[in-house]
Regions:
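Active-site-adjacent C-terminal substructures of enzyme catalytic domains
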Residues: 114-172
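Metal-coordinating catalytic core of metallo-dependent amide/deamination hydrolases
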Residues: 1-82, 86, 122-129, 134-135
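Catalytic beta/alpha-barrel core
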Residues: 76-80, 107-113
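Short, hinge-like loop/turn segments at secondary-structure boundaries
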Residues: 10-12, 93-96, 127, 147-150
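Short helix-capping segments at alpha-helix termini
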Residues: 14-15, 95-104
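Glycine-rich tight-turn/loop motif centered on a GG-T
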Residues: 41-57, 108, 143-155
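Short, surface-exposed connector motifs at secondary-structure boundaries
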Residues: 67-76, 100-106, 166-170
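Short, electropositive alpha-helical surface patch
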Residues: 83-98
Length: 172
């Protein structure tokens, strides 16, 4: 409803100037690694009863992505866990199918910290931007392997891999 009202008022992506600019739509898919609320594809290694806390069911995330694309807005989503990132990628794929011609929108994942090899490959294939937050490395690198296990930790924080694969990765 809020997005529809915003659009009815005449606001559009790219409007504005130096101090005010209408940018992409940003949502959250999960929480944080430290609080064990980042959504993982497997149980937390140090808390097997937890897999994270998804913010939206997949159907809702798909709807929000398609709604963004219909409005001409890039869809960017906070996703720290690998399952959250996969969910965002599923939503982007859904929106691009539902709203043809929107592949040029600069959809993205904010954080993109815990990733599997499959997730990295999908990001590269879809050309989704990554808004990395390297400031969290100082804390997360001390807990990453304990939280997600050695195998998943090895393919996480793989921003250089994404850069080498042609993905636009920014710090911020």
């Amino acid at each position: 409803e809020a997005l529809d009202e915003f659009l009815r008022a005449g606001f559009r992506y790219g409007q504005g100037r130096t101090h005010y600019f209408i940018g992409p739509r940003k949502l959250y898919a999960d929480g944080s690694l430290g609080a064990r609320t980042a959504v993982l594809s497997m149980p937390y290694a140090d808390a097997p009863q937890k897999r994270g806390v998804p913010i939206y069911p997949q159907e809702t995330l798909n709807h929000l992505a398609a709604q963004s694309h219909r409005a001409g807005l890039p869809f960017i989503v906070h996703a720290i866990g690998d399952a959250a990132a996969e969910s965002v990628l599923d939503a982007v794929e859904y929106a691009r199918r539902a709203v043809p011609g929107t592949e040029q929108l600069r959809d993205g994942i904010v954080h993109c910290q815990i990733t599997s090899r499959r997730t990295l490959e999908r990001i590269m294939a879809l050309g989704v931007d990554v808004y990395a937050q390297p400031v969290f490395l100082e804390y997360d690198l001390h807990i990453c392997e304990a939280r997600v296990g050695a195998a998943l930790a090895r393919t996480s924080y793989a921003w250089k891999t994404l850069l080498d694969g042609g993905v636009c990765v920014s710090a911020g």
